[in-house]
Amino acid sequence: GKAYQTSGGLHGVGASVVNALSSSMVVQVARNKELYEQRFSRGIALGNLEKIGNASNRRGTYVTFLPDKEIFGNHKFKPSRLFKSIRSKAYLFSGVEIRWKSEIRDGETPTDATFHFPGGLSDFLNETLNGVSTYANHPFAGSVDFNEKFQIPGKVEWAINWTPSRDGFVKSYCNTVPTPEGGTHESGFWAAILKSIKTF
């Protein structure tokens, strides 16, 4: 179905909303050893994309923004909440390196950190279950790209392990947005797992 086709967006929806709600947003892209920059204010481009220099040792995208005080007043970010969100994104985009830097010191969240999880969801599950007895030494993990297999847009990834304890947990995401109350994608996934186990 189309229920989750556009909700949450990978970066298009998020970036446009952040842009509209920021008094200043600067995007820098280091690509092919060159550094490009574009500046925005309240959703409006302040100029064209410009090459601003060389970037022989850099790569990736850097986004800096200031929330618009006319909209948000003097509200402050909660670094711990953002830190957890960014960490989960690093698990969801296996292999991507995300560098965290915060000028807000709250006493519990690091001001600098680097997240890189080549194993993606398996790394998340192993870290979460650290020290917990499991039936399998390694998570049952994989992914299916629906476009390659069925010629429809979409992809599913998973990592599962079983423990002797009844205290299990499920964490699901749709378009990198947490879905704490599950949803049709989670129900369908568990139905497929149960059917596969019964068939086995």
Language model features: what each stretch is:
Residues 1-130:
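GHKL-type ATPase core
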Residues 80, 88, 95-200:
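GHKL/Histidine-kinase-like ATPase module
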